[in-house]
Design a protein with these regions (language model features):
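SDR active-site strand-loop-helix element
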Residues: 7, 31, 77-81, 120-124
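Short, surface-exposed alpha-helical segments at coil->helix boundaries
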Residues: 15, 38-39
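Beta-rich interaction modules in large eukaryotic scaffold/regulatory proteins
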Residues: 42-43
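N-terminal Rossmann NAD(P)H-binding glycine-rich loop of SDR-like oxidoreductase domains
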Residues: 3-26, 31
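Conserved Rossmann-fold NAD(P)-dependent oxidoreductase catalytic core, especially the SDR/UDP-sugar
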Residues: 83, 89-142
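A generic structural signal for alpha->beta connector loops
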Residues: 25, 51-53, 115
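NAD(P)H-binding glycine-rich loop region in Rossmannoid oxidoreductase-like domains
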Residues: 35-37, 46-101
Length: 142
């Protein structure tokens, strides 16, 4: 059975991805910043499908620890983990640094583990700050 590492497993989009992956016959390893959220995620998934092929690992966007070992037995990766700040961040260390460094950690671990495919996501947050009077459009991202 092919396995997918889903980072940010407690997030809204991740819960839907995990459920769909399990429904479609994949095993899932979900990463959590805090393992205290495992039961919450497991219960949410169980409302849709049995969680027999769901496991969890602890990963932090700002730490190298665990990334290589977590990815080593996976075939695919969906990188959804990213900090979310309500309101404008005080500085880039709150939002930009964890997002970019976490993405680099995910990609390096995927390369080392020879992951077949990686899916990266983004958010409107990527273009929302620093443009006070601008209406954003598709020209603001690639």
């Amino acid at each position: 059975m092919e396995k997918v590492l889903v980072t940010g497993a407690s997030g809204y989009i991740a819960l839907h991805c995990i459920t769909e992956l399990l429904k479609n016959g994949y095993a899932v390893k979900g990463s959590l910043r805090s393992m205290n959220r495992e039961n919450e995620v497991r219960e949410a998934v169980k409302k849709e499908i049995p969680d027999n092929n769901l496991e969890f690992c602890k990963l932090d966007l700002m730490s190298d620890e665990g990334w290589d070992s977590s990815a080593s037995d996976c075939d695919y990766m969906i990188h959804l983990a990213s900090p979310f700040i309500v309101g404008e961040p005080k500085n880039e260390n709150e939002l930009i640094k964890p997002a970019t460094e976490g993405t680099m950690r995910a990609l390096k671990a995927a390369k080392k583990a020879v992951i077949k495919k990686v899916v990266l996501t983004s958010s409107i947050v990527a273009i929302s700050y620093g443009h006070n009077q601008k209406i954003c459009s598709s020209h603001d991202w690639t």
